[in-house]
Amino acid sequence: MLKWAIIFAIISFISGVFGFRSTSAGTASIAKFLFFLFALITLVLLVLGLLGIGVVA
């Protein structure tokens, strides 16, 4: 679970960098949406991983 949280954190960071520096309003709004979506997924997976709740492999 923590592996997925780290992956989504990296995706969130990358989409934030490209979205917040973009000049086009359309791509900036999409990247900002993706940034907050992946940030939310990161937080959920991080909490689930720390609590020990997850899929048993």
Curated annotation (Swiss-Prot):
* Record carries keyword Membrane: yes
HAMAP family from the xrefs?
UPF0391 (MF_01361)
Q: Which Gene Ontology cellular-component terms appear in the entry?
A: plasma membrane
Q: Tell me which InterPro entries the record gives.
A: DUF1328 (IPR009760)
Q: What is this protein called?
A: UPF0391 membrane protein NE0130
Any Pfam family hit: DUF1328
Tell me the keywords, alphabetical order: Cell membrane, Membrane, Transmembrane, Transmembrane helix
**Chief localization class?**
membrane
- What is the originating organism of this protein? Nitrosomonas europaea (strain ATCC 19718 / CIP 103999 / KCTC 2705 / NBRC 14298)
Compartments where located: Cell membrane
Q: Does the keyword Cell membrane apply?
A: yes
The UniProt similarity line reads: Belongs to the UPF0391 family.
Q: Where are the transmembrane segments?
A: 1-21, 33-53
Q: How does this protein sit in the membrane? A: Multi-pass membrane protein
